[in-house]
């Protein structure tokens, strides 16, 4: 008989026991933002008409276009079915990055790293790839202190609010060292910076608070390097990382050295080739910090299983005992 990890057994028990018996002992937290949707443009049905939002939808920061939703009907004698067609980018909203999302060239592929054609894509992920024990890193207090210098509002100018890699307002090597004893096979590191509050604040990458001219918290290069050092030393591979920013990396690590993305996306370059997965644009991570013991929480990533997919919008849950 196969020996399943404890977090798998916990989740299996949750799914099998009726809610009337389990809800009193478990807390479920939705870590996903809603996906705003728009009617299609008359000129191009693949593009959103931002003047025609559904309900209270507003545009969100994204590397793809806004989500397009159009409807057809299937009539019956008693009424009809609404049938929606949804057009959106894989890496839009709260979403999963599979290990195959980044394709390393020969200069960035490291010993022990897998070539892109050897990594799992969306349809190749099994259930154990999408669940895991939660390990919390909470830097929201440091972020709040920095934002207080500007009335709680992020500024793209690091002289006003500083989220550069050399600041103490991003996840650094010391934060990773602090959780070293919890780094193990299959765990998911969850990084709460409190940044999701700015998610619906606009789509201009240079000016609006969420991207903030790539001056935002996340993992700096030293944190990524320390995580790999610890995994290699212990001979383990974490399941993934969840963060409430647009891309796991700090803004400075994401944008790199210049406007040509030189030495950019450090976490993506080094971790995805090892098989680590990412959940980006997460929501409500602060709620996890308020449970009695976040170490008793598990992550569930409800990712799509489309063939050749490099990721996908996901309903992500934390289930806490």
Enumerate the language-model features and the residues they cover:
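Hydrophobic alpha-helical segments
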Residues: 9-10, 90
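Active-/binding-site microenvironments in catalytic and ligand-binding cores
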Residues: 22-321
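Bacterial N-terminal signal peptides that target proteins for export
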Residues: 1-9
């Amino acid at each position: 008989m196969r020996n399943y990890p404890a977090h798998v057994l916990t989740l299996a028990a949750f799914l099998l026991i009726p809610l009337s018996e389990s809800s009193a002992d478990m807390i479920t937290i939705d870590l996903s933002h809603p996906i705003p949707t728009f009617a299609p443009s008359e000129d191009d049905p693949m593009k959103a008409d931002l003047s025609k939002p559904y309900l209270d939808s507003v545009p969100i920061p994204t590397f793809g276009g806004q989500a397009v939703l159009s409807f057809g009907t299937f009539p019956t004698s008693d009424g009809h079915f609404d049938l929606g067609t949804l057009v959106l980018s894989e890496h839009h909203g709260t979403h999963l990055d599979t290990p195959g999302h980044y394709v390393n060239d020969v200069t960035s592929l490291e010993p022990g790293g897998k070539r892109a054609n050897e990594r799992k894509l969306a349809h190749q992920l099994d259930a154990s790839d999408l669940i895991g024990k939660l390990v919390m890193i909470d830097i929201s207090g440091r972020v709040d202190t920095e934002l207080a210098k500007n009335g709680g509002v992020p500024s793209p100018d690091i002289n006003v609010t500083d989220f550069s890699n050399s600041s103490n307002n991003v996840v650094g090597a010391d934060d990773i060292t602090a959780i070293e004893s919890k780094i193990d096979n299959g765990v998911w590191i969850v990084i709460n910076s409190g940044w999701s509050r700015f998610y619906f604040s606009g789509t201009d990458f240079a000016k609006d608070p969420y991207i903030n001219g790539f001056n935002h918290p996340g993992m700096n290069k030293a944190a990524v390097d320390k995580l790999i050092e610890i995994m290699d030393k212990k001979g383990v591979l974490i399941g993934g990382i969840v963060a409430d920013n647009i891309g796991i990396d700090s803004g400075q690590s994401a944008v790199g050295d210049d406007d040509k993305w030189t030495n950019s996306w450090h976490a993506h370059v080094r971790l995805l080739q090892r098989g680590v997965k990412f959940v980006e644009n997460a929501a409500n991570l602060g709620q996890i910090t308020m449970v009695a013991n976040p170490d008793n929480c598990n992550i569930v990533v409800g990712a799509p299983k489309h063939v050749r997919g490099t990721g996908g919008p996901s309903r992500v849950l934390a289930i806490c005992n």
